């Protein structure tokens, strides 16, 4: 398989699916669970867990940071919606699912909307917007669009939540909480 010859959306879809399968495969076969609260084992897990694709080995870290986040890859732009498609097998990330190359755009929209609808909360009176931890971890990816994280997320929540975010954001004492 020559990955360079794949259209960009097929390539993105391929690596999202490989990432999710690799996480699931590794968690099932690993003796030591990797959870949200243990940073060192998690970092090691992402650097050392890999699949061979053709002649090359791709670790979870290579796939997420290098290919999908476009840090080492010249043929893909970073699409922040990938963060709502990648499952790390933790409570702070979405559940693993398989994506289709020909419907990837709409599936990424749907995954993003579903995750944000479940996780984004707003307290207008208190001036607090609660966002998923993913938004803090990858804030630079969201902000690369020219929007703040809050503005970016507002496009993927129900209208009443987006209106609440806008009202809370107008306050001088706005607080953003990540959980």
Model regions: which residues?
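Interaction/scaffold regions that mediate signaling and macromolecular assembly across diverse proteins
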Residues: 1-179
